């Protein structure tokens, strides 16, 4: 039974992420926590949730499962996902969130020692959830006198203080810098505005009440959903704007003209600063195949190098790079950043704090100026799930044949890079019946058209 996707378990609360599933996953996590021969603290599981209306019931179900699996629960209540991850250092954690999904969805993310479960741990959870409690003792509740206890625990003050302290190592004091923060009625409202004010910013907050109905805008921060923030920044005095999704693991930046800054430009700015600030012999930035070559340009200019890993596998990429002797200073997918110097989790709140101090130091325009910003597009080509493997095998030959002057990498899809810095990536969607085509080029429409035609031909031929 495959439960976990690239970002935990996620789906409708009516059919997918049900209370029954939450109990079973909680019990499996409790068993996982108590099976380790370690300090007693490691048999604790911190449980938190975002502001979704179904979060309270699902958190109670997870707690019942964890405690019946023999581990103790520490209830964090409503918190950002990065705060839950922060609290899970030295123990396990479960976060109830569907991130940027619609309000009728929810999800489960599992952590250990500040890092999301790797695929091996996820498989163990899946096996225990699928097992029959009547025949498999590991799937059944522990003995009545071995159940764990449950207590409230507060983490927000400690998390906010830790983020502010870390961010002060970069950039300059905010000194009244005007910042607009669109929390999207998500739990980022409990952290980012307070931290930025503590750092000296003048903060104006939009959609700052936590509400699981997401009445202000859809939870996913896109140029369209951020129309109010964009107008607010363009018409007001804010130096820039910040937006989060429902659980504050994502961050979007809006410039003073009210335009969203491309996610890869934000990634390149932070990556370059971390490399320049590092005294490591081999500073590494880990990112994904769909990330722009502008990141490579700025990281290389700063004296570092870029390693790419499949989408949803940043932690694996960090481990691989460090095993090879590199010192990972930053890891990111577009809009989702890991700050290894602070913690091993995706953290949009910390990104907001660090970026704010960088902007206060130099201005957003100056930070963007050295970044090559070519036009970027992503399109989807229809492809039945059953054809994807054969289509991708065909494209491993067809793309090089169609673009003989390109450098080809087939480790995570088919990526073609050209001498002028433009590139394209073709990869199958993991959740929908499409093959995705990503491209960045001065004439991006022409490149996307040529690549899409090759993909459509491969789909038709299979």
Model feature map: region roles:
Residues 1-62, 68-69, 91-92, 148-176:
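An N-terminal, well-structured beta->alpha segment
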Residues 46-105, 195-254:
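N-terminal small/polar loop signature for handling phosphorylated ligands or for N-terminal nucleophile
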Residues 281-438, 444-462:
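Phosphate-binding and adjacent anionic-ligand microenvironments
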Residues 67, 76, 130-159, 255-334, ...:
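Proline/glycine-rich low-complexity loops and linkers
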Residues 104-229, 233:
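Gly/Ser/Thr-enriched, mixed-charge loops and adjacent short helices
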């Amino acid at each position: 039974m495959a439960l976990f996707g690239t970002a935990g378990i996620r789906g409708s609360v009516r059919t997918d992420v049900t209370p029954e599933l939450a109990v079973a996953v909680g019990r499996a996590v409790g068993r996982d926590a108590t099976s380790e021969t370690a300090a007693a603290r490691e048999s604790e599981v911190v449980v938190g949730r975002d502001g979704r209306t179904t979060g309270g019931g699902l958190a109670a179900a997870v707690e019942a499962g964890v405690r019946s699996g023999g581990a103790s629960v520490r209830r964090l209540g409503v918190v950002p996902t990065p705060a839950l991850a922060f609290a899970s250092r030295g123990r396990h954690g479960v976060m109830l969130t569907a991130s940027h999904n619609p309000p009728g969805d929810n999800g489960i993310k599992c952590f250990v020692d500040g890092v999301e479960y790797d695929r091996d741990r996820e498989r163990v959870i899946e096996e225990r959830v699928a097992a029959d409690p009547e025949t498999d003792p590991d799937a059944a509740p522990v003995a009545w006198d071995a159940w764990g206890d449950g207590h409230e625990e507060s983490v927000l003050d400690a998390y906010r203080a830790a983020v502010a302290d870390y961010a002060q190592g970069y950039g300059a004091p905010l000194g009244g810098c005007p910042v607009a923060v669109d929390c999207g009625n998500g739990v980022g409202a409990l952290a980012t505005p307070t931290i930025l004010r503590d750092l000296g910013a003048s903060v104006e907050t939009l959609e700052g009440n936590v509400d699981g109905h997401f009445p202000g805008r859809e939870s996913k921060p896109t140029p369209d959903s951020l129309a109010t923030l964009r107008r607010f920044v363009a018409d007001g005095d804010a130096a820039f704007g910040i937006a989060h999704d429902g659980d504050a693991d994502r961050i979007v930046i809006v410039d003073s003209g009210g335009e969203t800054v491309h996610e890869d430009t934000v990634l390149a700015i932070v990556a370059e600063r971390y490399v320049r600030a590092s005294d490591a012999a081999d500073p590494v930035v880990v990112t994904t195949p769909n990330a722009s070559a502008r990141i490579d340009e700025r990281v290389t200019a700063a004296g570092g190098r870029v390693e790419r890993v499949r989408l949803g596998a940043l932690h694996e990429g960090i481990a691989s790079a460090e095993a090879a002797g590199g010192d990972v200073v930053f890891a990111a997918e577009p809009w989702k950043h890991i700050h290894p110097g602070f913690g091993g989790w995706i953290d949009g709140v910390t990104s907001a704090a660090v970026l704010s101090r960088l902007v206060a130091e130099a201005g957003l325009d100056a930070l963007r100026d050295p970044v090559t910003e070519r036009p970027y597009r992503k399109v989807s080509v229809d492809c039945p799930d059953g054809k994807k493997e054969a289509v991708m095998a065909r494209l491993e030959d067809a793309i090089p044949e169609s673009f003989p002057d390109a450098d080809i990498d087939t480790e995570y899809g088919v990526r073609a890079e050209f001498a002028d810095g433009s590139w394209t990536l073709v990869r199958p969607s993991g959740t929908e019946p499409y093959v995705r085509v990503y491209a960045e080029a001065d004439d991006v429409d022409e490149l996307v058209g040529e690549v899409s035609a090759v993909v459509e031909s491969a789909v038709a031929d299979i």
